[in-house]
């Protein structure tokens, strides 16, 4: 919290995530962290990994991403000044493009924009493994920390780990997020994030 965000996926290993966090705490830029991860992958196989990293850099955000050539297709990432969006096993580039458009065009605070971006992937089979389930994804989560949050007790930590067949995880996460906002009388115009 207060420094940036790191997301590792595609053959996720906790050690790579922890190494990335340690590099960020040591002051490395997002690009330096990715270069380090590629050179020091815990399994010596960075081509199956995917990373997205942003940092605040004292008010001048930076972003970087990496998509290994052996991640499952369709795979890609896109970067903006204050975001990194990545995906693999996708229907196609249109999923990433939709997420980016929704992030950029959703008003509100960061959590609203992140939720909007995820809704941009709310298409049956966006993750092609889920086509037969009639859903976009296997699970969905939203984690947002305030700058001074304890890493083990962050401001928003919602997780839909799985749903019965045909129940959309992103819709369930949207309900959880809306309930969280209502239950906490959350107004990002006055409370930030």
Where are these predicted regions, by residue range?
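N-terminal nucleophile
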Residues: 1-193
């Amino acid at each position: 919290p207060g420094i940036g965000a790191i997301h590792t996926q595609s053959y996720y290993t906790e050690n790579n995530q922890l190494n990335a966090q340690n590099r960020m705490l040591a002051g490395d830029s997002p690009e330096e962290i990715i270069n380090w991860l590629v050179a020091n992958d815990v399994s010596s196989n960075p081509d199956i990994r995917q990373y997205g990293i942003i940092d605040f850099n004292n008010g001048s955000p930076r972003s970087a991403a990496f998509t290994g050539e052996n991640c499952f297709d369709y795979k890609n990432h896109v970067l903006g000044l204050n975001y990194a969006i990545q995906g693999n096993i996708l229907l196609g580039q249109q999923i990433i493009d939709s997420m980016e458009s929704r992030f950029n065009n959703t008003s509100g605070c960061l959590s609203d924009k992140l939720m909007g971006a995820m809704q941009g992937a709310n298409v049956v089979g966006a993750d092609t493994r889920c086509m037969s389930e009639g859903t976009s994804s296997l699970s969905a989560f939203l984690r947002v920390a305030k700058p001074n949050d304890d890493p083990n007790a962050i401001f928003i930590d919602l997780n839909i780990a799985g749903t019965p067949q045909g129940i959309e995880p992103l819709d369930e996460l949207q309900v959880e997020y809306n309930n969280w906002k209502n239950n906490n009388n959350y107004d990002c115009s006055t409370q930030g994030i």
